[in-house]
């Protein structure tokens, strides 16, 4: 069932694109109140420029200035070349055509200091993807033993590092602040993405690209999943604060940087890159950066499923703060978090998606090493993506856990079982694909994740739910990758912000029911907590924090106006009231 009218002819793609102005004019509750179902598909680790920067009509890569693109070293001097560490991008195997002497250690590279198309060097057909559970810190050379998809290595994406990389909105220290050096400047050909191709077929669903959408918090997946559901950084209660091995506080230098192992950054003092913020009130505490007992980098939960072998001292104590699930339940609105591989990981024997038999051992060959039946997580199941599993209210054995923490396979069943007159989806659904299907660099390919995303959208669109369901596809965080738009609070950029973020701009697209337009671009400023604001406004819930109280909700997505189409080759500057 389609939301709007499709293109009668593919040639009509050249017709006018619709757009929304950056300055939200207030909430359009009329449209929002007609939405009976909200679906949030939370993908992984890509910046907007990295993935959607070539979409027509958006503030994309063509709008980036040379000053933003050109990366500088720790001293502020522009690199001549981009050093690469991924084994498919180093020289050799690529011919060294660029020589750099801007740092203490000269190097040669095949890459000058600019953006580059990853697919030119690592095509989708390349068998560079690891088998589930294989860790390759600098990627894998093509081999029949690997999986296809054109995988790259992973790139660091952590709390203090990202703040350094943003450089007060200059956007020019992604490379210096990274463990992957020049890979930060890579991008994917937007028009080759499965999601792009799906949304450019005849009779595609009506959709909106939001090109001013920022990750809620600086850093990585763990923290941004917490901001997705609670709009706050979680507190680690009772941490050790004595400088011992069990002290999980970070130590940063005068620039706010916590790591001494990266190719181009050399700390000015002793540093420590750990789970928590820097401690407050110590001689080492650096003013101007978050301090305290806040968990900001990857932390394991107190409850199963957590990564096998995790030391108890490193597990985040159960959280008691309010979250969006609590508020929805109190209001009587149905909801669920659907995670790929959840029933295997949580030991829900026989539930949808269960693949481990009757015991006494985990029988799925792709089970995480060291797993003990019945907790049989997939080898690339990401424990820190299970945001509600950190909360006391959803601990094992509770009705709330059984009712609301579900397997992605069940979401598909509900959509497919919906009738012409009844949509079986919950009022609010969060979907978190398993690692092999979530687009995260390092352990899966962009194409594999994008294909899975298309299948999810087709499942929703093929059901009666499409007529009253607002679908949002967005990404938890930037994955360490460059974007040219300064987040709110960086270098004077306007918008809601605080010491936690928001961070780098990320892709976001909506499928909009009953739209009169095939395609719109919304230039309104959003961040991850706009998801919360939208749910809160739709169901008359109180804000969870000052951030979700201040940001725009998605009402403006429905307010499209005609705008001139301009694609990646159009150098006309993006016009927006917030830039």
What is the predicted function of each stretch?
Residues 1-4:
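Positively charged n-region of N-terminal signal peptides that target proteins for export
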Residues 19-21:
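N-terminal signal peptide c-region/cleavage motif recognized by signal peptidases
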Residues 23-579:
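N-terminal pro-sequences and low-complexity stem/linker regions of secreted or lumenal proteins
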């Amino acid at each position: 069932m389609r939301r709007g009218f499709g293109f009668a002819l593919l040639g009509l793609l050249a017709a006018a694109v619709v757009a929304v102005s950056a300055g939200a004019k207030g909430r359009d509750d009329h449209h929002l109140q007609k939405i009976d179902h909200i679906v949030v598909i939370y993908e992984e680790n890509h910046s907007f420029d990295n993935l959607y920067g070539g979409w027509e009509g958006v503030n994309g890569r063509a709008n980036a200035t040379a000053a933003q693109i050109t990366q500088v070293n720790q001293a502020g001097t522009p690199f001549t070349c981009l050093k690469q560490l991924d084994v498919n991008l180093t020289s050799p195997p690529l011919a060294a055509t660029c020589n750099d002497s801007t740092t203490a250690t000269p190097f040669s590279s095949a890459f000058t200091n600019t953006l580059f198309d990853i697919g030119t060097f690592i095509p989708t057909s390349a068998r560079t993807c690891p088998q589930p559970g294989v860790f390759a810190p600098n990627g894998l050379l093509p081999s029949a033993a690997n999986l296809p998809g054109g995988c790259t290595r992973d790139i660091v994406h952590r709390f203090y590092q990202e703040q350094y990389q943003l450089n007060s909105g200059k956007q020019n220290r992604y490379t210096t602040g990274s463990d992957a050096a020049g890979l930060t400047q890579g991008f994917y050909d937007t028009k080759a993405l499965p999601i792009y191709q799906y949304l450019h077929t005849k009779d595609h669903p009506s959709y909106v690209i939001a090109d001013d959408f920022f990750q809620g918090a600086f850093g990585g997946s763990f923290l941004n999943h917490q901001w997705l559901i609670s709009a706050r950084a979680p507190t680690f209660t009772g941490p050790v604060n004595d400088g011992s091995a069990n002290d999980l506080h970070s130590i940063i230098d005068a620039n706010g940087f916590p790591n001494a192992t990266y190719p181009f950054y050399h700390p000015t003092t002793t540093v420590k890159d750990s789970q928590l913020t820097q401690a407050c009130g110590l001689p080492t505490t650096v003013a101007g950066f978050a301090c305290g007992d806040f968990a900001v980098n990857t932390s394991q939960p107190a409850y199963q499923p957590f990564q096998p072998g995790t030391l108890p001292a490193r597990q985040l104590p159960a959280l008691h703060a309010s979250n969006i699930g609590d508020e929805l339940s109190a209001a009587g609105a149905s909801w669920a978090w659907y995670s790929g591989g959840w029933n295997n990981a949580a030991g829900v024997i026989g539930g949808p998606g269960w693949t481990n038999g009757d015991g006494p051992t985990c029988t799925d060959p792709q089970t995480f090493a060291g797993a003990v039946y019945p907790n049989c997580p997939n080898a690339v199941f990401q424990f820190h993506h299970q945001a509600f599993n950190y909360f006391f209210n959803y601990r094992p054995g509770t009705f709330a856990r059984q009712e609301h923490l579900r397997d992605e396979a069940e979401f598909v069943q509900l959509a497919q079982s919906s009738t012409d007159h009844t949509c079986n989806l919950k009022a609010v659904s969060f979907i978190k694909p398993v690692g092999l299907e979530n687009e995260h660099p390092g352990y899966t390919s962009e194409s594999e994740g994008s294909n899975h995303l298309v299948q999810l959208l087709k499942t929703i669109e093929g059901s009666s739910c499409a007529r009253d369901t607002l679908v949002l596809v967005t990404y938890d965080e930037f994955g360490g990758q460059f974007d040219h738009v300064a987040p709110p609070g960086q270098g004077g950029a306007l918008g809601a912000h605080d010491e936690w973020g928001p961070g780098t701009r990320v892709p976001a697209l909506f499928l909009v029911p009953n739209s009169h337009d095939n395609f719109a671009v919304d230039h309104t400023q959003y961040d991850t907590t706009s998801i919360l604001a939208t749910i809160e406004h739709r169901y008359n819930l109180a804000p969870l924090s000052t951030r979700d109280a201040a940001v725009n909700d998605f009402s403006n997505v429905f307010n499209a106006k005609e705008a001139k189409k301009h694609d990646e080759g159009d150098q006309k500057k993006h016009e927006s009231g917030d830039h």
